[in-house]
Amino acid sequence: MRPMVFEYPCDPVAAYLETQYMLGDALLVAPVLREDKKVQYYLPEGRWTDYFTGEVKTGGRYYEGEYDYFSLPLYVKENTLLATGAVNDRPDYDYRDGATLHLYELADGATCTCRMVDVKGADVCTITAERRGGVYTLKADADMNGLTVMLHGICAEGVTAENARIHADSVSGCASAVISTSTREIKITLE
């Protein structure tokens, strides 16, 4: 958990943001602090995806919304590869087992990396995602069998993949690839 100014030292607004914070380097959190449930938050420059709804917003400005105590503004920064676990009722489990890798708004020519750790914090797998045109390549230093990769914010007529089964949803703007073979690299192509 870090103040906004640590992640965005060149953004003059970030120095004055006391009611929101960064969770790691990719998640922006703006807690509900008012009884009327209204939250005003600032998104720095770039594209930000609402973690819960998938709505994409442009940064460099303030937003306001009404939330209850079971929701809050939680945004994922563009060019982020975020791992989520399959178990949500306990903190100590094999995080890699059944995990989903969420790839948010990866720009053409960009790369991003995600480290997966065990319950003691030791690295078990590091995955790098790269985009070249309509081809997304994910490479890992360990076997990726059993993982799911979800691409957020895509528009494509067709999606194909090597070493994975594909499901594309044009309504949500997401495509997912379930890795069902022992491999350390997959390529997902958007058409």
Predicted regions located by residue number:
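Short, ordered beta-strand-loop transition motifs
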Residues: 34, 128-135, 166-174, 181
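Surface-exposed interaction regions enriched in Ser/Thr/Asp/Glu
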Residues: 176-191
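Solvent-exposed beta-strand/loop surfaces of large extracellular or lumenal domains
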Residues: 51-69, 160-179
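Conserved catalytic/binding loops enriched for acidic/polar residues
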Residues: 120-123, 159, 186
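Catalytic core of carbohydrate-active enzymes
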Residues: 1-154
